[in-house]
């Protein structure tokens, strides 16, 4: 099973990716985690990324794709993976499709977790309070949701046109959402 998990901030992508990893016994690949690991390891890509981030800029698609290509070349992804945090725009979706085609591992499915904006704001505000994260205030959350709508939401259409997209209601208990995802994947 080769799967991309999409959804706005606070939709439960990371939580469900971890649960799916255990359910399907395939690795959960988070581009954020990959980036942090490469920087910590001091790899050539990590050093480039560190320099970019130190300037306050976004890490380029080329750097992210290079990290992803290296990760997808590892043995544990032979039977599949769950990708979270990538692609974030249509250019990245095209690059991912090209990369996966090159290595003979095309995506099986893309799951979009749907959650209403106001509930997302509530969820993230609750998480911020529990974790003491000051950057998760309602205004910054709304801005992040707008960035998602502007950049990442078009990726939904990209995969919908290719017949890969499954939309799943992301509201409910963790088990209910996992069950909906599994059902959407035909499992």
From Swiss-Prot:
Binding site for ATP: 10-15, 127, 172
Enzyme Commission number(s): 2.7.4.3
Localization: Cytoplasm
Region spans: LID: 126-136
UniProt keyword annotation of ATP-binding present: yes
Top enzyme class: transferase
Record-level Gene Ontology MF annotations: adenylate kinase activity; ATP binding
Cellular component GO terms, alphabetical: cytoplasm
Listed pathway(s): Purine metabolism; AMP biosynthesis via salvage pathway; AMP from ADP: step 1/1
Record key words, sorted: ATP-binding, Cytoplasm, Kinase, Nucleotide biosynthesis, Nucleotide-binding, Transferase
Residues noted as binding AMP in the record, renumbered to the chain: 31, 36, 57-59, 85-88, 92, 133, 144
Region (NMP): 30-59
GO terms of biological process kind: AMP salvage
Recorded catalytic activity of this chain's protein: AMP + ATP = 2 ADP
Keyword check for Metal-binding: no
PANTHER family cross-referenced by the UniProt entry: NUCLEOTIDE KINASE
Classification via NCBIfam families: PRK00279.1-3 (NF001381), PRK14527.1 (NF011100), PRK14528.1 (NF011101), PRK14531.1 (NF011104), PRK14532.1 (NF011105)
Family, as annotated: Belongs to the adenylate kinase family.
Domain comment, as recorded: Consists of three domains, a large central CORE domain and two small peripheral domains, NMPbind and LID, which undergo movements during catalysis. The LID domain closes over the site of phosphoryl transfer upon ATP binding. Assembling and dissambling the active center during each catalytic cycle provides an effective means to prevent ATP hydrolysis.
Subunit structure: Monomer.
Chain's role: Catalyzes the reversible transfer of the terminal phosphate group between ATP and AMP. Plays an important role in cellular energy homeostasis and in adenine nucleotide metabolism.
Entry protein name: Adenylate kinase
Gene responsible for this protein: adk
């Amino acid at each position: 099973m080769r799967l991309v998990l999409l959804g706005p901030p606070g939709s439960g992508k990371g939580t469900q990716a971890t649960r799916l990893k255990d359910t399907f016994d395939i690795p959960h690949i988070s581009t954020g985690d990959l980036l942090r690991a490469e920087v910590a390891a001091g790899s050539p890509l990590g050093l480039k990324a560190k320099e970019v981030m130190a300037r306050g800029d976004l890490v380029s698609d080329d750097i992210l794709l290079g990290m992803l290509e290296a990760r997808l070349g590892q043995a544990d992804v032979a039977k599949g993976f769950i990708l979270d945090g990538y692609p974030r725009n249509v250019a990245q979706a095209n690059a991912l499709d090209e990369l996966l085609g090159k290595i003979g591992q095309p995506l099986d499915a893309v799951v979009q977790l749907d959650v209403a904006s106001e509930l997302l704001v509530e969820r993230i505000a609750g998480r911020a309070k529990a974790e003491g994260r000051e950057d998760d205030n309602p205004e910054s959350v709304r801005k992040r949701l707008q960035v998602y709508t502007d950049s990442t939401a078009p990726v939904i259409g990209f995969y919908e046109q290719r017949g890969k997209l499954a939309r799943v209601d992301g509201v409910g208990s963790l088990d209910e959402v996992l069950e909906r995802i599994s059902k959407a994947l035909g499992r």
